[in-house]
Amino acid sequence: MFSRDSVVAERKWAVLVGVTTSGSHASTHWFKSFYEACQKRHIMICGVDFEEELKNKIPPISVDCLIRISGLYRRSLDADEIAKIVTEIETRCPGRVALSTALRENYQLQNSLLAEAIGVARNTADCIERIQDKPACRDALRKAGIYQPQSLRIVGVTS
């Protein structure tokens, strides 16, 4: 039998860590594409961001739930902050978290910690540290036999 409770229990959520943007064309496109993908799959969006960021910037997409982390932006979150966010997600976002992501590079580490606590797939903190250390990342790729171009050259365009 169909009931409101069964609909709530089946609701899926995407946690988006870092819902504010610099306003660049690229980031606006990423957020819009993420929003459209969630809408297409009937996934609700729970935005998570720092209070100070939210004072100065407006999320470029609609979110169904917005969780504020107290204070200024910081690169990492401690265990108590993570536990508090997880509890708030469980309280305010009935159903299940299907995914957790960060579209902006400077929110990847916070997302990794939160996704681990929620129990969804993620890049580990070590992986993120390696990716964000560009010279070390390029060196690891080279050692694995994967060579990247040093710069992008477009045929017919002079620099």
Each language-model region and where it sits:
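Active-site helix-to-loop segments that bind/position phosphate- or nucleotide-bearing substrates
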Residues: 148
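ATP-binding N-terminal substructure of ATP-dependent carboxylate-amine bond-forming enzymes
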Residues: 1-127, 136, 143, 155-158
